[in-house]
């Protein structure tokens, strides 16, 4: 089986390029949901400018409201509303793949109980809007507004925030939460600009063309041949709805997804009624620990995330002993991984009726080479007579023509082509390039210059030379499948630092040179932990398209695990000495 995995990896190691949705392709990034509203430029001052109004930006605003006396907190976002990922992603079938009771933040604070174990995109979006109302974050927000530069004014102790609307906003603090899924990317295919049919990216869904909404009902596709490039987590949710309405659906696959059972169900009213105060944080931490391989007395979430991790952990450490021969432990992990993937491959055989299609859908790689997918209707889609799987044997689509898509030497005529090809990757694309602006700190130092060879931070949050500036990302910080939980921990930490600055009468805080150096050394010490594993995976997002060593080690997440990262932040706050920071 190792040889089979190697073969599947190697036949995909042909390199894959992407085209960013900019310049001639900028139409793929335009907002189809909110009509642009013109306004006069603003020149004013705020306490905090938060760039990004997704979960990270909202939690920054919420925790600052709760922990500090700062009054004017301004969210700035290019979208037409709050929500981030959940504003942009409205495609039919969109849901979270992490349990909604632990993914949707501040449930207790807002008095919200999700309707299902795995909530729909519209429900999540509405909840994020509720958070913005609850913490009065709409009041000073600027939407449909893109930051063009952040520049520190040393004499005034303020950040100058410039935007594409001509605004000049002075802010004591800036926090950047530009997110993971806001800049769509396209496949770098010959002929991309020549396709004469209709096309769009899944994060800019064109309901005017398809009809329907996020729940389905795509009535305008009844006479359309629709193609989708990409078979990751978006297509897993989307395909059943397209198949229901399109005359013909053609899915172009480079690498099969590993699709496990979702097991969604309505929220039991009696369970919700019996929840004790603090239930959400306890549930989050329980899930966080279990999915990080840290044993717990019980599994509160009981889903495929926790159950799979438990199986792998039990195989490696059957008695809970953390010692033993590392080679034997690695072999045990590989065996358990193989058995889990065999389970998923067997599920395909049990559902998909055509043997050739079933064989093409089988994934041959380790469980966590890619983000696992969960769905109870995707595989069944391939039993429909109007659905065709075009397996490209790892080579990907060859090119586009005015009429359609060429794959495996054959042209597939299409009326509509949908790109489910993901987003600019935060580990591979320089931060300021993804952000779309540069950050100019003390003495004219540009973040693009300081980070030319990779990031340098304290705890992934603050940078020497950039006072009163906070960056939320996974770079040099904790990384976990529940992104919302990690953002919650980071924003609590951010608010704690600002509160300390305010209470102690200081004006400026930044990472010290020594503090930053010490953290960077720790990042580098642990940064190679995943490379051997990722090198044996099929090319994809996690391993830089098959070249994990091509990513700057400085752009790694904290390699000691997300549980330890959260503990590091908590111990730091408890110590109270603000180690690694300079305050003036």
Swiss-Prot record:
Reaction catalyzed: 1-deoxy-11-oxopentalenate + NADPH + O2 + H(+) = pentalenolactone D + NADP(+) + H2O
Domain of life: Bacteria
Keyword check for Flavoprotein: yes
Gene: penE
Family matches, as PANTHER family: BLR3857 PROTEIN, L-ORNITHINE N(5)-MONOOXYGENASE-RELATED
UniProt: FAD binding residues: 55-56, 77-78, 85-86, 97-98, 103, 147, 486
NCBIfam families for the chain: Neo-PentlctneDsynPtlE
InterPro entries noted in UniProt: FAD-binding_Monooxygenases, FAD/NAD-bd_sf, Neo-PentlctneDsynPtlE
Entry-linked SUPFAM superfamilies: FAD/NAD(P)-binding domain
Lineage, opening ranks: Bacteria, Bacillati, Actinomycetota, Actinomycetes, Kitasatosporales
Feature type site, description Transition state stabilizer: 371
Family designation: Belongs to the FAD-binding monooxygenase family.
Designated name of the protein: Pentalenolactone D synthase
